[in-house]
């Protein structure tokens, strides 16, 4: 029997992460990144102060504040060689598999160099990069 959702929140090397509860096929939508939309200018001010690490800019005008705990997509961690990507479709931010993901594997996206530089004090420590 397939689980209701193709993912589960669990312990990862960096705290909590989102893991495949069952195999996920390449190009499948996994989870939507949800939360209130705030003006991007307001989000940029929060970002500069590092007041909220769950901001996801969707365009020049709007940013999703993914900090509410109901947004399970906030647990998707960074990897330099990710197995998912963020895709904007009809104003919704979806995480989609870029390769087949085995059951039990952590679901990851590439946060981008700017985010990694701002929030990862010791640099990237993903599985591809390892501890430095």
Indicate residue ranges for each PLM-predicted region:
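Catalytic cores of histone-lysine modification enzymes
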Residues: 1-86
């Amino acid at each position: 029997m397939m689980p209701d959702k193709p993912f589960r929140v669990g312990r990862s090397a960096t705290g909590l992460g989102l893991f495949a509860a069952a195999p996920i096929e390449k190009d499948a939508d996994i989870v939507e990144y949800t939360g209130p939309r705030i003006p991007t200018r307001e989000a940029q001010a929060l970002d500069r102060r590092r007041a909220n690490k769950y901001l996801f800019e969707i365009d020049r005008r709007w940013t999703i504040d993914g900090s509410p705990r109901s947004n399970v997509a906030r647990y998707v961690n960074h990897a330099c060689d990710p197995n998912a990507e963020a895709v904007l479709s009809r104003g919704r931010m979806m995480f989609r598999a870029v390769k087949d993901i085995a059951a039990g594997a952590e679901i990851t996206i590439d946060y981008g160099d700017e985010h990694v530089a701002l929030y990862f004090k010791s640099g990237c420590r993903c599985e591809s990069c390892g501890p430095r």
